[in-house]
A protein has these predicted regions:
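Charged catalytic carboxylate motif
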Residues: 32, 91, 173
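N-terminal pre-catalytic segment of deacetylase/amide-hydrolase enzymes
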Residues: 1-20, 25-41, 55-58, 176-193
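Metal-dependent polysaccharide deacetylase catalytic core of the NodB/CE4 family, i.e.
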Residues: 16-17, 27, 38-165
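Catalytic grooves of carbohydrate-active enzymes
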Residues: 148-192
Length: 193
């Protein structure tokens, strides 16, 4: 396995999934996500961009206040495959000044071996096995929902985005995905920090 310490899904005997949200927090979308999660009694994990936490500390504080777990998604949403290791690690460390978590998810799911090796002793790299593609302009909300229905399995780590780019599809797909998953016997867990 390329990155044996990396978590792609968390297999379980009973039906459970891990909802995760990347790229926030932002005041235009994240509070709505929090309200949806509260409505359904769900705890999730938010992989936050440090610069968004810096700009919107009250939104980040609300994520924590409502009992969700958080992870580091770099300071500036850097794509690891095109950035040198030293710069990438510095960006992660800068974000850590705003985000107190040992969880890390590389933006775009891309990280080089040397970058992963540099952080593996201090951080747990959490990827995903189901990306909803809610950010895609080529998909509508129904297609995003279909991605969840088609690809979910026990222990899936599901990625949505609390971002402006994903907002339209997210607002359609998230409540419907939650309801469908509940109807099909899934429970929801945050990724332990």
């Amino acid at each position: 396995m390329l990155f044996p310490e990396t978590v792609w899904r968390i297999p379980m005997k009973d039906k459970a999934v891990y909802l995760t949200f990347d790229d926030g927090p932002i005041p235009e979308v994240t509070p709505w996500v929090l309200d949806m999660l509260d409505k359904y009694g769900i705890k999730a994990t938010f992989f936050c961009v440090g610069d968004n936490v810096r700009k919107h500390p009250e939104t980040y504080a609300e994520v924590l206040r409502r009992g969700h777990s958080v992870g580091n998604h770099t300071m500036h949403h850097l794509q690891g495959s095109i950035v040198r290791r030293k710069r990438y690690i510095a960006d992660i460390e800068e974000a850590h000044g705003y985000i107190d978590s040992a969880l890390f998810r590389p933006p775009h799911g891309l990280i080089r071996w040397k970058q992963a090796a540099a952080i593996k002793d201090n951080m747990r790299i959490v990827m995903y096995d189901l990306v909803t593609r809610d950010y895609s302009k080529k998909l509508n909300g129904e297609q995003v929902l279909d991605n969840v229905k088609r690809y979910v399995r026990n222990g899936s780590i599901v990625v949505f985005h609390d971002s402006l780019k994903a907002e339209k599809n997210l607002r359609y797909a998230l409540p419907r995905a939650i309801e469908w998953l509940q109807e099909n016997g899934y429970r929801f867990l945050p990724i332990p920090m």
